[in-house]
Amino acid sequence: MMEPPLSKRNPPALRLADLATAQAQQLQNMTGFPVLVGPPAHSQRRAVAMHLHPRDLGTDPGVASTALGPEHMAQASGQGPCPPSQGLPGLFQVPAPAARSVASGTHPGARTHPDGGGSSGAQASAPPPPAPPLPPSQSSSPPPPPPPPPALSGYTATNSGGGSSSGKGHSRDFVLRRDLSATAPAAAMHGAPLGGEQRSGSSSPQHPTPPPHPAGMFISASGTYAGRDGGGSALFPALHDSPGAPGGHPLNGQMRLGLAAAAAAAAELYGRAEPPFAPRSGDAHYGAVAAAAAAALHGYGAVNLNLNLAAAAAAAAAAGPGPHLQHHAPPPAPPPAPAPHPHHPHLPGAAGAFLRYMRQPIKRELICKWLDPEELAGPPASADSGVKPCSKTFGTMHELVNHVTVEHVGGPEQSSHVCFWEDCPREGKPFKAKYKLINHIRVHTGEKPFPCPFPGCGKVFARSENLKIHKRTHTGEKPFKCEFDGCDRKFANSSDRKKHSHVHTSDKPYYCKIRGCDKSYTHPSSLRKHMKIHCKSPPPSPGALGYSSVGTPVGDPLSPVLDPTRSRSSTLSPQVTNLNEWYVCQASGAPSHLHTPSSNGTTSESEDEEMYGNPEVMRTIH
């Protein structure tokens, strides 16, 4: 009597066309909880019939023995029969014939409440009555699966799809744990997937899926409950799982947590006892879990990191490694922390100590070595005994310059402008103007207040004239044209033009002063190349010579004052009498003082530029 209504009520339930069409839209609501969701009975039974086919029940008894579907219990459909040790504890096992009878018969006790909230415990615990198996063509609408076990009673259901919505309208059905923080360590000890379900495509025979735990949390990381190829839009596209790479780490609930990874990496770098995202509590077990999570993060990148929280928590648990960790080697241990340097404190719990140290300015002790002119003008006996300098120390260059300018150089009342810096080569010779003395003092203090304004250059200069000449290298300006007719050569500074003029006048003011050598040249670079032939041994390194092996730049003027410590007397012939006579400027007609800048205060501005712009001269004055 019941056969016509059933066949009339759901005639196309087992047609091949419907089954083929239903594969494109896999079930998205949680079919393992028939009492927690509220779709109509006929749509619910049709969805179960599409998912739990009698042929599938015969080959995979693990599907019928679990309250949740295979996509929610982290069990892939292609893994074969589930061993008894990997089933849910507390659930009864149904053999294959009984499973077929369950699929074909109707459960009279499985009723849903009108509000779709749940069912009574007596109705949920009643086993289905045995029934003879029917062929697939004669089977009626299958009943819903068995009710959930009592271990899942701590979950609450949220149905936002409505009572009349289909499977695609339940993409927002989630199962949430009430107290996750209290049960997360316990779930991690049993290898429960803490972040989501295991996708079927990421499983492999070498890495079987771990068994679920009753107290676990089974929430899809992508926001849907369809399979890998299932339809339906993801609720959270940013957390959608990407297919696992070959040979990758099969993780439960793969989620890209770049921020957490960066925080854990910073905690490991700065030696924090726990990651920054951990609560500041005295829970010893949570500290161990956090430390294991930081260790598991070692070796992974900070961007698009697949974080396996379950493996990290299980590594820190007191129990042995779970089934999932038995197939993987333990994560590599972090490298040993370097020994604390006295200038770089890396103390546990002080993550910002290094950054605070780097923000501090570099402390320097700048000592004023200005001598007292009154003591120098005293009797010779007191002067010979040694005049003590000022010896005041300053932390910044600005303080030192202000001290020398105000207290030693003086104001307009000073009539003589003499440098009394210790070991100054001028030996008390005055300057004509105060600004010249101030520019000269920068040679002793090292002040360079004129930086290059071009980005990326980074050069600084002691005088504004030197900066003006340097900027021509960026702009390409060459305002000094050769004065001889027929020559179109242009130069960035006047000194280079003067050196070039010797080519037209046939003057050779640079000659070799070694005995027996009467060579002379029009340019100092040619003389420097010539001096290499007087070396009996191979030429030493450029640093030992004081200039490059091919000669110093053309723009550098030559000075007769050379540092004795930078000479190469050991490599020259014994015929050399005076090393300072290597580079001598011959006077042709009028006295030429361009290449031997004097320090008597009568030099022109161009000569002053060369003197202060030449780094070699600055080194010799020191």
Curated annotation (Swiss-Prot):
**By what name is this protein known?**
Zinc finger protein ZIC 5
Q: Which residues carry this modification: Phosphoserine?
A: 537, 541, 559
Disulfide partners: none
Database matches in PROSITE patterns: ZINC_FINGER_C2H2_1 (PS00028), ZINC_FINGER_C2H2_2 (PS50157)
Gene3D superfamilies, A to Z: Classic Zinc Finger
What are the start and end residues of every segment in region (Disordered)?
50-171, 190-223, 232-251, 321-349, 531-573, 590-622
Give the UniProt subcellular location, in the record's own words: Nucleus
Kindly list the ranges of residues that form C2H2-type zinc fingers according to the record: 422-444, 450-474, 480-504, 510-534
Query: In its keyword annotation, does this UniProt entry include Endoplasmic reticulum?
Result: no
Record field: compositional bias (Polar residues): 595-604
The disruption phenotype is: Mice exhibited insufficient neural tube closure at the rostral end and malformation of neural-crest-derived facial bones especially the mandible. After birth, mice were significantly smaller than their littermates and most of them died within 2 months.
What the entry lists under InterPro entries is as follows: GLI-like, Znf-C2H2_ZIC1-5/GLI1-3-like, Znf_C2H2_sf, Znf_C2H2_type, Znf_ZIC
Q: Which family does it belong to?
A: Belongs to the GLI C2H2-type zinc-finger protein family.
Q: Please note every region of biased composition (Pro residues).
A: 126-151, 329-340
